[in-house]
């Protein structure tokens, strides 16, 4: 009896690991990962954008169970510009919100965003995502572990001073 999880929203600066997290979720759950590039949904022809988003969501439901990764969701799903684009942005946004609220198939949504202030409040309402997580840049200890994992295959080059690498990569 527990309800199916709907999805999560991952917030953080570019390069902090949001996309990798989306890929890891699908891999861990052994489910296909579908990437929805919001920027490619929008077309100049009247009605094309709305049709593109409906087709993308139908594809995800046909493949379900799966993970639908919506990368940089704020770039295409804002309520701004509804007048300038003939309302296309608003209609695409509405289509996605309705689908997120009413979908019946097990499609887990992992949306990523760089700026929470760019997101429409409707997207953050209860019922759209199960959780919203902020992913920060790695701490020195986390950077040390990342280097240790990725440089292990280069042990023959004698990279031994991981502490120096960690200290030289603040802000990364």
Where do the model's predicted regions map?
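Walker A/P-loop NTP-binding motif of AAA+ ATPase domains
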Residues: 1-167
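A glycine-rich beta-turn/hairpin centered on an aromatic-Pro dipeptide
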Residues: 170
């Amino acid at each position: 009896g527990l309800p199916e999880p709907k999805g999560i929203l991952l917030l953080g600066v570019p390069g902090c690991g949001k996309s990798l997290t989306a890929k890891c979720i699908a891999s861990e759950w052994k489910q296909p990962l579908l990437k929805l590039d919001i920027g490619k949904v929008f077309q100049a022809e009247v009605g094309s954008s709305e049709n593109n988003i409906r087709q993308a969501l139908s594809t995800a439901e046909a493949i379900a169970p799966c993970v639908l990764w919506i990368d940089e969701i704020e770039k295409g799903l804002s309520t701004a510009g509804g007048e300038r684009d003939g309302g296309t942005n608003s209609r695409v946004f509405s289509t996605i919100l309705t689908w997120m609220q009413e979908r019946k198939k097990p499609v887990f949504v992992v949306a990523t965003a760089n700026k929470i202030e760019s997101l429409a409040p409707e997207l953050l309402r209860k019922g759209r995502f199960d959780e919203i997580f902020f992913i920060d840049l790695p701490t020195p200890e986390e950077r040390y572990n990342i280097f240790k994992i990725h440089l292990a295959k280069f042990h023959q080059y004698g990279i031994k001073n991981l502490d120096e690498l960690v200290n030289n990569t603040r802000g990364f």
